[in-house]
């Protein structure tokens, strides 16, 4: 599919899947950076069936240039333009035998650095000392999510239903 086809898929269905954005070596570099994470920090959640890091890009700044590669930045620019910024970053590693269940839901909150009451924003939450708020629909309608799988993902083992 061309990027124009992907853009049409987003317009028609609300999502698209782009394969091959990262090389094996690039994915390995991201994985290696993850291995250096301090799992005792408040933004990390570690159990027998889950490893998660909230504020992922803030907690592991070495992954920023790895994730936002020239190729990914070019794709984002062509699909959405250049007027964008990150509002949330979370890493999940959920092993195959994990029984951690998350029901169908929509992520509607953005992360912000402080609580500042503004018309149309709310309700507010705080998770691991990070404020979150649901923005107005006009903002939500202009947001996009990038999901990067570091391992092989198929329709049988994929973690996202759209």
Language model: regions and residue ranges:
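Non-heme Fe(II) oxygenase catalytic core, chiefly the N-lobe of the double-stranded beta-helix
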Residues: 2-13, 22-162
